[in-house]
Amino acid sequence: MIDKQFDKETFKKSVKDNVKFLYRRKLEEATQEQLFQAVSYTVKDVIIDNWLDTQNAYEKQDPKIVYYMSMEFLMGRALGNNLLNLGAYGEVKEALEELGIDINALEDQEPDPALGNGGLGRLAACFLDSLATLGYSAYGCGIRYRYGMFKQKIENGYQVEVPDNWLKYGNPFEIKRDEYAVEVKFGGYVDVEMHNGRQKFVQKGYQSVRAVPYDMPIVGYGNHIVNTLRIWDAEAINNFNLDSFDKGEYQKAVEQENLARTICEVLYPNDNHMAGKELRLKQQYFFISASVQRAIAKYKETHDDIRKFHEKVTFQLNDTHPTVAVAELMRILVDEEGLEWDEAWEITRKTCAYTNHTIMAEALETVSYTHLRAHETRSNL
């Protein structure tokens, strides 16, 4: 059941207020999309109370945190699922009926979040649901794709693939967490400098994007617990180069913005050509680097000794795509935290766990050494 006593009249008033404040309309004038958004924001208000309570409880308990890293999460529609897990579906259905709103029509209005495609993504979503229901402290970590893969239309008897613009009207269940944004660097070269008698590897000449997290609630079934799916969007560090634009170099003026947008456009871009292989590698490194950076920063908010990182954090790597987390954690521990290689490797081994989904060679993703060297950030790899 809902943690607090459900008040039908308060819920109905909140729906009406959301329609008014979001769209400057009366309830009876609202479209189905506007009603869906208004009701979803009302439900999110209920969820947020439990979300805050959950995070406060975790902070007091200081449990080990699982970061479930996956290229995809096939979550399904959120409105009905959240209400079922809150134990509030029947009560909300009744309240909406009194407003003349059909809850089934609202559920049909919601697009499927285009964050996953098949069994790999569905398994990831099921794990997140189970972790919340069992009361484990966990984050899902992935990419906030703008178009996912595609949606199908049948025209003249043939399948036509078109972009799945699931974010066209926004996602009412997500919260942008700009305060946790981090920089992710690609390419460049490495200078070796001496600091306090130690070699320090300094990356220079790189391209970078700003990784911005969006949090979605994962509601546990009947237990008031709400965990987090954190999906990362890419933004340009500098959106617009006015100097290039004034020189007539219009493509160069938006080069950084285009780089950022490309990273999060689609799930599994075609990799039959080199540009596609490069984009996939960038996608994987992008969300892994952002997630690892944030996990370390969160750990250091309450713990002083990075050498005990593995005692409080586990990275669960869902198939081959996120395995670059091993290299990224090593890079940060050695280059930024100043640990020796063997010590960092021991921590990394105890932190990273891997889920294998197949033994077929053609399904196990690989990256050529030559291709990887083009994007390496260590001169001695």
Language-model-derived ranges and their functions:
Residues 2-61, 65-66, 77-83:
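Extended, charge-enriched "interface" segments that sit outside catalytic cores
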Residues 65-101, 223-314:
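Function-dense linear segments that define catalytic or interfacial modules
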Residues 85-125:
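Well-ordered mid-protein domain cores that form the structural environment of catalytic cofactors
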Residues 128-129, 133-151, 341-360:
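Glycine-rich phosphate/pyrophosphate-binding loops
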Residues 148-223:
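Extended, Lys/Arg-enriched charged tracts that mediate electrostatic binding to polyanionic substrates
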Residues 289-296, 328-337:
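Alpha-helical support elements that line or immediately flank enzyme active sites
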Residues 316-328, 351-355:
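Core structural elements
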Residues 370-377:
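Conserved small/polar residues in nucleotide/adenosyl-binding loops
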